Regions:
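Divalent metal-coordination and catalytic microenvironments
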Residues: 13, 45, 77, 103, ...
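Active-site metal-binding loops of divalent metal-dependent hydrolases
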Residues: 28-30, 50, 82, 101-105, ...
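Active-site environment of divalent metal-dependent phosphoester hydrolases
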Residues: 12, 31-35, 50-56, 106-108, ...
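Binuclear metal-ion centers of metallo-dependent hydrolases, dominated by the metallo-beta-lactamase
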Residues: 3-9, 84, 145, 149-205
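Conserved beta-strand hairpin/beta-sheet module of binuclear metal-dependent hydrolase folds
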Residues: 1-33, 85-102, 121
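Portal/gating segments that form or line small-molecule/metal binding sites
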Residues: 55-99
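Active-site-proximal loop/helix segments of hydrolase catalytic cores
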Residues: 83-145
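Active-site metal-binding motif and surrounding structural segment of the metallo-beta-lactamase
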Residues: 25, 29-69, 114-123, 127
Length: 205
């Protein structure tokens, strides 16, 4: 599986199931300057908080923007409620479980945490308390969910200059990040077994 961060809460997943490539785009958006790249044509487009300001995508992807359980091209997608009308996505593909917390501002209640506990990979917004989780709250939630890999999203970048820098979250989490990568390429066998890894992705495009 390939995982890339495209700024804000937007993430691109490239996976293969039964010899078929499946491209997934989460929270594609229209930046204030420039255009969202159209070279990526997803089969699935997921939105955590509605489609306002959604990017224009080529082809006609299957869109998920409501709660429920979906199976598309042998990829399982569970859309579960978060706080303040935010949707949390739990995605199962290639034997991996990925949880994307969406545009979360407030951590879910303990009962809701059980639905997303123990993912292989956690994509968590860490940028601020206005649009996303505060770094301190994000670190506490990441620890509570016990993922094997943590990938912070929605921190400061050229399309989100008002968000807090990634350094604030790293300091709160207390984990030394792996070297910054342009994308994460991972298989089930590559997951850490005894520790949690923090991986910081460069914004793509």
């Amino acid at each position: 599986m390939h995982i890339s961060w495209l700024g804000q809460t937007c993430v691109k997943l490239q996976t293969k199931n039964l010899d078929e490539d499946v491209n997934i785009l989460i929270d594609g958006y229209r930046p204030k300057t420039g255009d969202f790249p159209r070279s990526f044509s997803p089969q699935l487009a997921l939105y955590s908080k509605g489609m306002e300001n959604a990017a224009t995508l080529s082809q006609n992807p299957f869109v998920i923007d409501s709660l429920g359980e979906f199976e598309i091209k042998n990829v399982m997608v569970y859309a579960v409620p978060g706080s303040e009308e935010n949707i949390i996505y739990k995605i199962s593909a290639e034997g991996l479980t990925i949880v994307h917390l969406g545009r979360m501002k407030k951590a879910p209640e303990n009962g809701d945490l059980e639905k997303i506990l123990g993912p292989d990979i956690l994509l968590i917004p860490v940028g601020d308390g206005q649009n996303y989780l505060e770094p301190k709250a994000a670190a506490a939630l990441a620890n509570a969910l016990e993922p094997r890999i943590i990938i912070p999203i929605a921190h400061k970048c050229d399309t989100d200059p008002d968000a807090k820098p990634i350094t604030s979250f790293i300091a709160e989490l207390g984990l030394k990040p792996e070297a910054t990568e342009k994308k994460l390429i991972i298989k089930k066998k590559d997951l850490p077994q005894e520790e949690t890894k923090l991986i910081v992705l460069e914004k793509e495009y």
